[in-house]
Every structure is written in C-alpha cells, then in structure tokens.
Amino acid sequence: MNTTKRILAIQSSVCHGYVGNRAATFPLQLLGWDVDAIPTVELSNHAGYPIVKGRTLSAEQILDLYKGVSAANPSGYECLLTGYARGIGSVKAIMEIVRSVKSKNKKAFWVFDPVLGDNGRLYVEESIIPLYREMLPFADLITPNGFEAEILSGMRINSIDTAFKCVECLQQKYKVPRVVISSFVVEENGVEKLYCIGSSIYSKSFFVLIPVIPGIFRGTGDLFTALMAAHIAESPDCTESLASIKEDKLKKSVEMALSSVHEVIQKTADRISALGVEEYHPAYAELCIVNSQNSIIAPSKLFEAVYYY
C-alpha cells in the first residue's frame, strides 16, 4: 500500500525557470510528497523576461484537469496548495476544487498563497481581491507577502507592530487560523529591514529578521509556500487531522522554510557572481533549486524565530 503523502498544487507553470509549480514540485518531492500539479497558466518563462509566450487556462480547462487527476487518485489529498491564478473564472474554479478536495478528505490542509502582486504593483485584476477575501475563511494557512497582506486587510504596514496588527485583523475578520506574512520591508532608525512574521490561533506570534541578499530573484515566494506546506502538513501516518495541529509547528515550519529559501538564494547569488557577467539577464537569476537539494532537505543553518510577546 502506498503511504506517500499526496498534495495537489494549483498555480502557474513555466517551461523554463523556477516559479509557480516549477519552483514547488521538486522541493515537495524531495521532502516526501507525491505532487499532482494543475497549471492556471502555461508560459514559456516568467514575466521578468523580455519575451513571454504561452496561454491562460480557462476555468473549464482547470476543472477538467482536476476531474482527471481526481479520478486517477481516488484516495484524495492530504494537502492542497494554491497560488497564482489569472481571472475571476480561474479563481472560482480553484475554490470549487478546494471544496471538492475537502469534501473527500475533511483532514485536508489548504495552504493558500493569495498572489496579488508585490512592491506596490498588482499582478492580477482588482476584481479578484474580493474573491480572495471570501476564500480566506476556508484556508488553514495563508502566506501573503506584505503588499498582499495590506490589500487583504485594508491596513498599512510601516513597522513590525503594524504588521502584527494586520495579521490580527486577518485572523479576527476572516477567521484564518494561521497567517504568515512571508516578507515585508520596514525602516528602523534609517535602515531598511526585511522581516517574516507568523501567527497561529494555537500559539504565540513570532518574527524572523532576514539578512538581505542583493538581487532580483523570482519564485522565492512560491518556493517558500511550497516548503511551508511540506513542513506544516507533515504527519507520520496521515491519520491525525492536519487542520488541528496545535503545537508550535508553524514557528518551526517557518524557520525551516526560510532557512532553505535563504540558502537557495545565496547559491543563486554566488552563481551570478561566478559567471562574472556585465549585462544582466533574468536567466542568470533563476533559482538554483536542483543544486540546492541538501539545503531544501536540511538547511545547514536554521533561522531562529523570536516571539513577539
């Protein structure tokens, strides 16, 4: 009997590079998960390249693919990971799939990355925002970046204190049991600092101060969310309700995921330096995921989260 944990990942797909499901699938497999991946868009590469080819899948196509993988996997899924989707129809299709997965396995753990944009710029239609807010109460964990957390909560983040107020708003207003703001920058005493914070209704809130590695690296949020899903939904025999994990698993999962992502970024930055190229090309900054297998499985140095109160 196959006891390997199975996850359904629904987000963007690229032929070249490491964003969306391309950034998520291999790391999840390394950490012991069987991955069924459904694309919301199929692109040649990410949008940071000068030329991007591909297509957006319709809601009908997404649902059709789900019907196929669902029939092929009658035992269902222990975990569900959702990320970038383009258009209202695609978002509604994802919510329909979430309901279906959870109806077949009430213990299924949903990790929802509400991809809206970053650095003050939306990547999606504004009409998606209210739909995401409607979806929040059904998620077991959400992993917005700072910009996305601001949009969903309607609050401004300009300090670590306001970031935690933003998290509190999301938990109280939308009843989300676990919130991790994957990254946000605030100025402290004239110095910009990068933070990740997390909060669970089952344990204390915490934060991690992240050393900044200069550069433009795409797919880091997708990798982080995949690693969060792998670690927090980990269960030895999959009989325990994953949606009722009450110990400090969130804090430990963030420490592991952040440490792995940071090492992957550092390896990528080192590769760029070793190339010695004068003219930047986005291909040079594709995440070194394949060469970072040890960092994904067991990062050499763990970040230590600090309790907020």
From Swiss-Prot:
Its cofactor is a divalent metal cation. Pfam families: Phos_pyr_kin. It comes from the Eukaryota. GO terms for cellular component: cytosol; nucleus. GO terms for biological process: pyridoxal 5'-phosphate salvage. Keywords: ATP-binding, Cytoplasm, Kinase, Metal-binding, Nucleotide-binding, Nucleus, Transferase, Zinc. Substrate binds at S12, Y123, D222. It catalyses: pyridoxal + ATP = pyridoxal 5'-phosphate + ADP + H(+). ATP binds at residues 182-183, 209-221. Disulfide bonds: none annotated. One of its GO terms (molecular function) is pyridoxal kinase activity. It is an enzyme of class 2 (transferase). It is found in: Cytoplasm; Nucleus. InterPro entries: PM/HMP-P_kinase-1, PyrdxlKinase, Ribokinase-like. NCBIfam families: pyridox_kin. Required for synthesis of pyridoxal-5-phosphate from vitamin B6. Belongs to the pyridoxine kinase family. This is Putative pyridoxal kinase C6F6.11c. It comes from Schizosaccharomyces pombe (strain 972 / ATCC 24843).
